From Swiss-Prot:
Its main location: cytoplasm. This is Imidazole glycerol phosphate synthase subunit HisH. It is found in: Cytoplasm. Pathway: Amino-acid biosynthesis; L-histidine biosynthesis; L-histidine from 5-phospho-alpha-D-ribose 1-diphosphate: step 5/9. IGPS catalyzes the conversion of PRFAR and glutamine to IGP, AICAR and glutamate. The HisH subunit catalyzes the hydrolysis of glutamine to glutamate and ammonia as part of the synthesis of IGP and AICAR. The resulting ammonia molecule is channeled to the active site of HisF. It comes from Methanosarcina barkeri (strain Fusaro / DSM 804). One of its GO terms (biological process) is L-histidine biosynthetic process. The gene is hisH. Pfam families: GATase. The active site is at C79 (nucleophile), H183, E185. SUPFAM superfamilies: Class I glutamine amidotransferase-like (SSF52317). Keywords: Amino-acid biosynthesis, Cytoplasm, Glutamine amidotransferase, Histidine biosynthesis, Hydrolase, Lyase. Heterodimer of HisH and HisF. Residues 3-202 form the Glutamine amidotransferase type-1 domain.
Length: 202
């Protein structure tokens, strides 16, 4: 069986991601150990909280994550986990991300729409990629976030509109480092299919 590691770096709803992966037939490990990370067939970066805090927590294993990304093996960032993959974020103060995918994380502008963006919304698939194999365009998925990845990034896999268009999913140029702003583990059958697609990539 493919070994999937859910990265434990002090932030994130690890158990819900673990249950989602178990539902699609995987037996993921939860670990922050560099050796276990590098030995994994697939790596998931969950995340709930502030970008600055996440980067501080990731700092001791930043080099390990970068090495894993270079290996070509699949890696998936979820919610805040997607945001930390990017070049930078304006949350709090301008903070550098892991810069594994080019793009900026921005704050939703003040408008009549409530922030954070919480709930179900449809996504537009922009590129063919194994992560979205069998996922119909305009599928609904579940979001909880106050910051977004700018769709100016050519790395957008899928977009969503909440007052403005933003990147609901991103991918690096090699195709192995991916992110979803939405929570696949909370997105019903569609989300579980996306998790299954990730496992199948590993």
């Amino acid at each position: 069986m493919k070994r999937i590691v859910i990265l434990d770096y002090g932030l994130g709803n690890l158990r819900s991601v673990q249950k989602g992966l178990e539902h699609v037939g995987s037996s993921p490990a939860i670990s922050g150990d560099p050796e276990e990370i590098l030995a994994a067939d697939g790596l998931i970066l969950p995340g709930v909280g502030a970008f600055v805090d996440a980067m501080k927590c990731l700092d001791p294993i930043k080099g390990t994550i970068e090495e894993y990304a270079r290996s070509g093996k699949p890696m998936l960032g979820i919610c805040l986990g997607q945001q930390v993959l990017m070049s930078s974020s304006e949350e709090g103060k301008l903070t550098d991300g892991l810069d594994l995918i080019s793009g900026k994380v921005l704050r939703f502008p003040k408008s009549e729409l409530k922030v954070p963006h919480i709930g179900w919304n449809n996504i537009k698939i922009k590129q063919d990629h194994p992560l979205f194999e069998g996922i119909p365009d305009n599928s609904f998925v579940y979001f909880v976030h106050s910051f977004y990845v700018d769709t100016a990034s050519e790395n957008t896999l899928a977009s969503c509109n909440y007052g403005l268009d933003f990147s609901a999913s991103v991918v690096n140029s090699k195709g192995n480092v991916m992110g979803t702003q939405f929570h696949p583990e909370k997105s019903g059958a569609i989300g579980l299919k996306i998790l299954k697609n990730f496992v199948d990539m590993c």
